[in-house]
UniProtKB/Swiss-Prot annotation:
Family: Belongs to the heat shock protein 90 family.
Main localization of the protein described in the UniProt heading: cytoplasm
Gene3D superfamilies named in the record: 3.30.230.80, 3.40.50.11260, Heat shock protein 90, C-terminal domain, Histidine kinase-like ATPase, C-terminal domain
Name of the protein in its database record: Chaperone protein HtpG
Organism: Vibrio vulnificus (strain CMCP6)
Region annotation C: where it falls in the sequence: 562-634
Classification of source organism: Bacteria, Pseudomonadati, Pseudomonadota, Gammaproteobacteria, Vibrionales
């Protein structure tokens, strides 16, 4: 290695999040400690990718050493394991930035989700991406020697830490480009100071790495005995997995490659590997994770596919190839048609990019369609993890709106459960004769939806209603207006018409009752004034005296709540007050001749209706006064 210590040594403190991560990782990932090798080899592979990319415009960065690879050696006497690469390397500033801090958005949120429960924590830490810090699972101290490509030998850096509160960084001289990571192994990490143990782990985790991973081994004589001479022996295939034939790749290899590109610990739910030739030549390898990333709902978090051009790594998190509602998809795309000097800005308006985005989107949706059709249980697993972001699809992807809609799942009155298992396709298949609309109800919770008074008439007529209680649902329904030629109809809107399910005798009776109650409606409207938009009778209720509904083109209650929660200005919602003339309480109100007492009845019935609809009211004290007055009178 021929490094000599120079000067400018300083001791620095770790960022507080690094301390937390180190502590949690050492304790939570102890049972799966061999993953440190996967992480460090994966980092070395990334360093080689980055050098290749930068050398496209500056070949001198290779420094006459273009054969990139990773080398592992160990020294039992000194109790060290060394992982060396001749990739891009790091400058002093980069060492401090990458090895002393966690430069990720949402770090505080990540730590708040940790439960101190080992199995759950290890899963979350895996999703977060432990990378370099995984070295401390098996080492009680780590030394890093590195020189960035393009810098002189005396601009190399030595970093050292015992994994506690501090680390040191100093200038050294290092002739070779790249990074050496020297692990000073713990007692329980010494199992990795063994050639066959290392071979086993490399074969398990790193066979798919696109550069050679070699191990230092002793040369054997003709009799098979070890000599003092050592050599480097390549352990892995060193062929990029996605360039191989699908028939030659095992499920285990696909699963390990997923863990390499995603830094996830769990196996993926499913994947799709495709090579396309024609107008656009490209290979895609797309994975659906089995668990949602911890920061999936943070739309600002960078996500996307790895982009390669002609097998040369270009960038991570290329979000241009996948719509935002599929931001959980992991994997890569390798294009033969994009220029090697492509940038994020060029990708933005590139026709090839648009074509690849469309193809990858269809590929993922087709994968999910097959899963939904062939394995209902597995699809439900997917929906529980990713259903919320899938509901962003109809607004974002007009071209695939019907396809996305067919993948959505909801609760409904047909199934007595909060589980979202009902597809729109199955709802349409069960529609009653004469039914031309898909009925739905939005609410704050499943319990609120299930017990909504708006459902009473639908239950009586045997009409299924989709129950929506995710915060995003009301917003979703602004964009999802029809499915399979059937319009959606909110059952809390004033324009709801169920007359096609009523006989002529029933209609005639309702008309008579409506006329008889006209004076009660007018008295109620006179009392309420402009507090409501309108007062009218309704025959949609059975056990409830009154409800409030919104006009067809008025903002709904749940949408108003969504905007308010987001801190946006919300226009006042003017409700239509509907009273049930067949209910005992409404009849009592109608019989009341004293206008002051009549007003108290109106306050109670309107208050009840507002509570059922909104879960709150503007003036609870007025409502309570009216109730107390009526109870006292009784």
């Amino acid at each position: 290695m021929n490094e000599t210590v120079a000067n400018n040594k300083e001791t620095r403190g770790f960022q507080s999040e690094v301390k937390q991560l180190l502590h949690l990782m050492i304790h939570s990932l102890y049972s799966n400690k061999e993953i440190f090798l996967r992480e460090l080899i994966s980092n070395a592979s990334d360093a080689a990718d980055k050098l290749r990319f930068q050398a496209l415009s500056n070949p001198a960065l290779y420094e006459n050493d273009a054969e990139l690879g990773v080398k592992l050696s160990f020294n039992e006497e000194h109790n060290t394991l060394t992982i060396s690469d001749n990739g891009i390397g790091m400058s002093r500033e980069e060492v401090i930035s990458h090895l002393g801090t966690i430069a990720k958005s949402g770090t505080a949120e990540f730590f708040s989700k940790l439960s101190q429960e080992q199995s759950k924590d290890s899963q979350l830490i895996g999703q977060f991406g432990v990378g370099f810090y995984s070295a401390f699972i098996v080492a009680d101290a780590v030394t890093v020697r590195t020189r960035a490509a393009g810098l002189s030998a005396d601009q190399a850096v030595l970093w050292h830490s015992a994994g506690e509160g501090e680390y040191t960084v100093e200038d050294i001289t290092k002739e070779s480009r790249g990074t050496d990571i020297i692990l000073h192994m713990r007692e329980d990490g010494k199992e990795f100071l063994n050639e066959w143990r290392l071979r086993d782990v490399i074969g398990k985790y790193s066979d798919h790495i696109g550069i050679p991973v070699s191990i230092q081994t002793r040369v054997r004589d003709e009799e098979g005995k070890e000599t003092e001479e050592v050599k480097w022996e390549q352990i892995n295939k060193a062929q990029a997995l996605w360039t191989r034939n699908k028939s030659d790749i095992s499920d285990e290899e696909y699963q390990e490659f997923y863990k390499h590109v995603s830094h996830d610990f769990a196996d993926p739910l499913l994947w799709s590997h495709n090579r396309v030739e024609g107008k656009n030549d490209y290979t895609s390898l797309l994975y659906i994770p089995s668990k949602a990333p911890w920061d999936m709902m943070n739309r600002d978090h960078k996500s996307g596919l790895k982009l390669y051009v002609q097998r040369v790594f270009i960038m991570d998190d290329a979000e241009q190839f996948m719509p935002s509602y599929l931001r959980f998809v992991r994997g890569l795309i390798d294009s033969n048609d994009l220029p090697l000097n492509v940038s994020r800005e060029i990708l933005q308006d590139n026709k090839v990019t648009q074509s690849l985005r469309g193809a990858c989107t269809k590929r993922v949706l087709t994968m999910l369609e097959r899963l939904a059709k062939n394995d209902t249980d597995k699809y439900q697993t997917f929906w529980k993890e990713f259903g919320l972001v899938m509901k962003e699809g109809p607004a974002e992807d007009y071209a695939n709106r019907e396809k996305v809609a067919s993948l959505l799942r909801f609760a409904s009155t047909e199934v007595d459960s909060a589980e979202q298992t009902v597809s729109l396709e199955s709802y349409v298949e069960r529609m009653k004769e004469g039914q031309d609309k898909i009925y739905y109800l939005t609410a704050d919770s499943y319990a609120a939806a299930k017990n909504s008074p708006h459902l009473e008439q639908f239950k009586a007529k045997g009409l299924e209603v989709i129950l929506m209680f995710d915060r995003i649902d009301e917003w979703l329904m602004n964009y999802l207006t029809e499915f399979d030629g059937k319009q959606f109809q909110s059952i809390t809107k004033a324009g709801l018409d169920l007359s096609q399910f009523e006989d002529e005798q029933e209609k005639e009776k309702q008309k008579e009752t409506e006329q008889e109650f006209q004076s009660v409606v007018e008295r109620t409207k006179s009392y309420l004034g402009d507090r409501v938009k309108e007062v009218r009778t309704t025959f949609k209720l059975a056990n409830t005296p009154a409800v409030v509904v919104t006009d067809d083109f008025e903002m709904g209650t749940q949408m108003a709540k969504l905007l308010a929660a987001a801190g946006q200005a919300v226009p006042e919602v003017k409700y239509i007050f509907e009273i049930n003339p067949n209910h005992t309480l409404v009849k009592q109100m109608a019989d009341e001749t004293d206008e002051e007492a009549f007003g108290r009845w109106v306050e109670v019935l309107l208050g009840q209706a507002m509570l059922a609809e909104r879960g709150s009211m503007e003036d609870p004290s007025q409502f309570l006064t009216a109730i107390n007055s009526l109870l006292t009178k009784g």
